Amino acid sequence: MRVFMTGAGGGMGFESFKAMLPDLGKLYDLVLLLRDSEKNRKLFAPYMDTKGLTIHWGDLLNREDVADCVQGADIVLHIAAFVSPQADYFPRKAMANNYGSTRNLIEAIQSLDQGDSTRFVYIGTVAETGDRMPPIHWGRVGDPIKPSMFDYYAVSKVAAERYVIESGLTYWVSLRQTGIIGPAMAKIRDPIQFHNCLDNVLEYASDRDSGRLMRNLCAYEAEGTLDPSFWGHVYNIGGGESCRVDTYTMYKIMYGEIGIKNIDYVIDPKVNATRNFHGQYYLDSDKLENYLHFRSDSMQYFYDAYLKELGPAKPFGRIICKLPGGQKLMGAIIKSTFNKLLESEHGPRYWLKNNMEDHMPTGAVARPGRPFPRKPAKWTTSPIGTRWCPWTTATTKPSPRASSTGPIWPGLPNSGAESSSPRP
């Protein structure tokens, strides 16, 4: 069997590549289309002589490069994407890459008369469903597609996913990726961290589990054990209950690891969005797990990666926080590192200073006269901060309601024609 994978030089792609290595030359051969960059050349130098591996140096927007790789492929794993936060800075590039590459791949499959044989695996995103703040933070495939304002990445992925679904391919699937925890997330230093609301929730998945997901899909298909009913659907990728967390709790644990027990020393609600991001807990992420059995990690994997990224700052911070007034001092040091981000192009303070009125309704800036209230100085004493717990700390899937007239799940509307059991 022949597998063609895009995006192997990225986070999820490289983890998938590493997970697939033991199978190469045995269960299937692997073809990669990689951008010819110094980074990719260095990253894949140790694997150039791997049995069952073929590397094409080229561009997904070049139709000839794409056709060369698609020809004879039994499975196409389209993992490559121009993602946030980079997509926020270059929205046209996001659309050209994310939609354009998907279209090129599908057109190549069809032009090679492989539309009835090639399995096409598209990686979508949780951002497609946009803002799902409590109390509508439990979601499922089939919920409204509504990217948040200014989320050009999400718009490009919606367009690409629709193209896949309407392509006419016999075997396709869209797997909507969530926030990916791991070393890469621990390294993020970008204003996007202030776009995430403190009472927002996400059901994350680890980079390693995401790689295992791709490997298992290919292995099961090669072995003939993947249920044919898997194809022709959209699924949510999620790590399950152990990977569900709200933003505030995540920060509380992260900073608690270095000794800061009072999160108000670090978190300033005035610089975090109150809406217009994305995220939800999934009612249906177990479906994909039941097919592909990929879950292994929990949120602790991310906290460990964060502490490793801190390096020498971790023991230093713990020592400081044990001293009188140390927690407050350490909090001030951490806050000072945020200032440059807040005042950069996509930072809330930048929007405020430059009177970017179109960004104000997103809730990312506290300002008098706007259609949302002035934000409190402390999260733990704010109206939201004191009432959010029952919603977001409950990470166990809610039980279906017995009523056939009310919502089946909290925060989700009933069509009026459904029974009391959740949709399949």
Question: Which residue ranges define each predicted feature?
Answer:
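Conserved glycine-rich Rossmann-like NAD(P)H-binding loop of the short-chain dehydrogenase/reductase
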Residues: 24-39
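NAD(P)H-binding glycine-rich loop region in Rossmannoid oxidoreductase-like domains
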Residues: 49-97
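Substrate-positioning beta->alpha
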Residues: 196-223, 233
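Mid/C-terminal beta-alpha module of Rossmann-like enzyme folds, strongest
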Residues: 217-291, 297-305, 310-323, 327-386
